[in-house]
A protein has these predicted regions:
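Membrane-interface "cap" regions at the ends of multi-pass membrane proteins
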Residues: 2-59, 95, 106-109, 113, ...
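Extracellular loop-to-transmembrane helix junctions
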Residues: 58-108, 113-119, 132-159, 273-274, ...
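Cytosolic C-terminal regulatory domains/tails of membrane transporters and channels
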Residues: 1-28, 497-650
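C-terminal membrane-solvent junction of multi-pass transporters and transport-like membrane proteins
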Residues: 371-383, 418-471, 509-511
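Loop-to-transmembrane helix boundary motifs in multi-pass membrane proteins
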Residues: 112, 152-158, 254-277, 360-397, ...
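Extracellular/periplasmic helix-exit of transmembrane alpha-helices
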Residues: 197-207, 265-319
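Hydrophobic alpha-helical segments and their helix-loop junctions in multi-pass secondary transporters
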Residues: 185-216, 282-290, 419-436, 491-500
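Helix-loop-helix junctions that connect adjacent transmembrane segments
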Residues: 183-243, 295, 300, 469, ...
Length: 650
């Protein structure tokens, strides 16, 4: 059976390969990628949000008419400015804790409870990142191939399987390929925007882009509180562009030395690039297409606005712009879609490393079982990301791969992480200020603390805005999942702490006392080689007494057992238990308890054989009495279970 399980594991992970964590220092240097490669890989999470963040801003503002839609660029600029300030303050955590991530920052400075909360939010954020990425990729794929309309769930699940296959067979030599999707996506989007702007500026008459449809002109020009709430909702949905920033804190080790400096610079460059591209996409969409293009709505206004929006919402903004610039079903549009899907794939795949690292740290800190720590098994990391794939698949199926529904769940966990980590860094700088520092160092510390205070205020405001505007739409689900996972981690940590206290060895602990004597009991169900081998091992163990215990179902069977025992002539006392219509496991465990009560200061060693077959399927053919008896005897104190294997001959 063990060989069958091992073969099943190998079917998933295929051939083994060396982990870079076990290399020497010189060998590890050769496996660290260039800064451009590491920055592109880590920045995929931020840049991939450009595939759906502009859609959410424009789709939200379309419901408010001209007044709201005219502020789309302002909303994008606000998102970019807030993102810039948050990144400026977030960089300090990479300098202070280059290998810890948000969990270690919070765990060290605020306490274990807050650290567990951040860890739960990180896991939920990773699940939602994979779900949103594959749902968005499926939306682009279905938009490119219309015959797959209505099959979003199947396409997203197929993409999850492809992601699992790619991640299972990654190689260190393939790390240079990580940069290709990021640079390819940025290059294609820049070309798309430049071409669109040139066509928009040089167009005359009808032009390449169309103006606002007549239905939107009929919307009220001035709105009250509802319009401003709509702007806040658009801002909160646009803040999904910030959700990939926490990836850098977990992947600082991927950068060449000095790792913290290079990681912080790369984060700043990626954030600036994402902010500029977000503003540019929203500008082109607002002044060009207004989200509703002639591809689905005629300029004469034959469709009502709600129906037009529902039809056009299925086509992402980037693809709409590509349709207007390059034309539908052209090579340019195909390249744009492929570039977008590739960056979404890379963003989802990079999350696997974050989950594996976070789960490993949690296991090491006593918040999860220790076998989840990757250093103890090369399959423990595979368990983490395979579970991530399964949970993400469940989320995709439950939401029907609806990107709008997933976006409402998405940003909550990310801003829990950002807000709590900013608070932890404020505590960190307060601790540094209590120490004696020179004038220059103290000024630098005060400046860093001020930036983190600004970052904490901004992330708190954004978090409150997200909760206020998206709570009913689904933010409460994310909060519930984070609280549920936090409760599991906290409960296991409490159990682990109590267990460590109970098993802790003191100098005069009772567990250190040497028992007076050891008694052996051999369970015999029939006279064969496995049972005789178990009896021989028990006699050779040096026990003060060895007792053979056999079972008989009738008086005739009891006489036969005694006759066979006399023929063997072994100098071992025999005890026969009568088991007519009674559970033999319960009868044997009762006898062992009776022997244990008669000799309370001695250790009782129970021997029983087990036949080991040559093939995995042979274990199915044998009785399960050995396992049931082992479970029953384990509850008896000061009782040692000894399994004597008997392997079949080849």
């Amino acid at each position: 059976m063990l060989h069958f399980v091992a073969n099943m594991k190998r079917a998933v992970a295929l051939w083994p390969f060396t982990s870079h964590r076990h290399f020497t220092e010189e060998e590890s240097k050769r496996h660290i990628p260039f800064q451009r490669v590491a920055a592109a890989a880590c920045g995929a999470g931020i840049l991939s949000s450009l595939a759906y963040a502009p859609d959410q801003i424009l789709m939200t503002l379309t419901g408010g008419g001209v007044f709201s839609l005219s502020h789309s660029v302002g909303v994008a600029v606000c998102v970019a400015l807030v993102f810039t300030l948050v990144v400026m303050s977030y960089r300090h955590s990479m300098y202070a804790y280059p290998r810890g991530g948000e969990y270690e920052v919070t765990y060290t400075n605020i306490g274990p409870s807050w650290g567990i909360l951040v860890a739960a939010a990180v896991i939920i954020d990773c699940v939602l990142t994979v779900s949103v990425s594959v749902a968005s990729a499926a939306q682009y794929f279905v938009s490119l191939f219309p015959f797959l309309a209505g099959k979003h769930v199947y396409v997203a699940c197929a993409m999850l399987c492809v992601l699992a296959a790619i991640h299972a067979r990654q190689r260190h030599r393939m790390r240079a390929l990580w940069a290709i999707p990021t640079y390819f996506f940025v290059t294609i989007i820049v070309i798309l925007l430049i071409t669109g702007c040139i066509q928009l500026l040089t167009a005359s008459g009808e032009g390449v882009f169309v103006a606002v449809p007549p239905q939107i002109h009929e919307a009220p020009v001035s709105v009250g509180l509802a319009g401003y709430i709509l702007l806040l909702r658009a801002f909160s949905l646009g803040c999904t562009v910030m959700t990939g920033a926490e990836t850098f804190s977990y992947d600082v080790y991927r950068f060449p030395r000095p790792q913290s400096v290079r990681a912080a610079r790369s984060l700043s460059k990626i954030a600036a690039c994402a902010g500029l591209l977000l503003i540019a996409l929203v500008c082109v969409s607002q002044y060009g297409d207004r989200l509703i293009s002639p591809l689905t709505v005629e300029s004469s206004g034959t469709y009502p606005l709600s129906e037009a929006v529902s039809q056009k919402a299925r086509i992402p903004v980037i693809m709409q712009v590509a349709h207007r610039v390059f034309g539908p079903q052209t090579l340019g549009t195909f390249i744009v879609v492929i570039a977008t899907i590739s960056i979404l794939f890379l963003a989802a795949r990079m999350v696997f490393h974050t989950v594996t690292s976070q789960v490993s740290v949690l296991a090491l800190q006593g918040c999860m079982p220790i076998y989840w720590h990757h250093r103890y098994s090369r399959f423990s990391g595979a368990y983490a990301w395979m579970l991530l794939i399964c949970v993400a698949g469940v989320v995709v199926v439950m939401t029907q791969a609806n990107l709008a529904t997933l976006i409402h769940l998405y940003a909550v966990a990310a801003f829990i992480i950002l807000t709590v980590s900013q608070l932890a860094m404020i505590r960190y700088w307060n601790t540094q200020l209590r120490e004696r520092q020179t004038g220059g160092a103290r000024k630098q510390t005060l400046r860093s603390r001020s930036l983190n205070i600004v970052g904490f205020i901004l992330t708190s405001i954004v978090f409150v805005v997200i909760l206020a505007t998206e709570f009913i739409q689904g933010a409460w689900v994310t909060l519930a999942m984070v609280v549920f996972l936090y409760a599991i981690y906290a409960a296991y940590r409490h159990y682990h702490t109590k267990l460590e206290y109970e098993v802790n060895v003191n100098q005069w602990d009772e567990a250190c006392r040497v028992p007076n004597r050891v008694r052996a009991v051999v369970l015999i169900s029939k006279w064969d080689k496995p049972h005789m081998r178990a009896l021989a091992v028990a006699r050779a163990s040096g026990a003060v007494t060895v007792e053979a215990v056999a079972l008989a179902v009738s008086a005739t069977a009891e006489d036969l057992v005694r006759e066979q025992w006399r023929e063997l002539g072994l100098p071992v006392p025999l005890t026969i238990l009568y088991t007519s219509k009674r559970d033999m496991v319960a009868l044997l465990s009762d006898h062992i308890r009776l022997v244990r009560e008669q000799y309370p200061h001695e250790v009782l060693s129970v021997y029983f054989p087990q036949v080991i077959g040559k093939y995995w399927w042979e274990s199915i053919l044998h009785r399960r009495i050995t396992r049931a008896l082992r479970l029953a005897v384990m509850d008896i104190p000061d009782t040692v279970l000894t399994l004597v294997p008997w392997k079949r001959a080849n």
